[in-house]
Amino acid sequence: MTANFIRALAVKSFDDPDRRRCPDKAEFDLVTVDDYSVARLILAPGWRWSVSAKPAELTNFCEHHHLGYCISGQLEVETADGGRSTIHAKDTYALPPGHDEWVVGEEPFVGVEFLGAASFGRPRSFGMHALI
């Protein structure tokens, strides 16, 4: 396990993110505090990774790790091996590489991600994450 250290006080708002990108039916707001990246995801009703992101990612499934907290909405996740779960408001979640995901219902999915967020702004990442 890696040791994590916070070196300085840092406070930032998603209302004034370091980066904001709005690919198909999504908004990603990224802030960096100290050396840590945190992202707010807003996924609109009808958003599905295999439809909205797969064409840019060029992989059969999302190959990123995600560790997050759902603020509102619902997100259905299905892994490549057939595992399936629904993320609801107030749930924490960990998603391994090799999954599809989609918004359930008519309410946007709003989440905050702590692992996986750094790839949202990385210029040499795979597809969708490189665009954010």
Predicted regions and their residues:
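Short beta-strand segments
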Residues: 39, 83-85, 110
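Short beta-strand segments in beta-sandwich/barrel cores
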Residues: 48-49, 73-78, 101
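Short acidic-glycine-tyrosine-enriched beta hairpin
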Residues: 79-98
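Short, conserved beta-strand element in jelly-roll/cupin
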Residues: 59-77
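Conserved GNAT-family N-acetyltransferase fold
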Residues: 41-43, 68, 93
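Ligand-binding loop in jelly-roll beta-barrel domains
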Residues: 96-121
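A short, N-terminal "cap"/entry segment at the start of jelly-roll beta-barrel domains
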Residues: 1-42, 50-51, 126-132
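Catalytic core of non-heme Fe(II) oxygenases with the double-stranded beta-helix
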Residues: 48-62
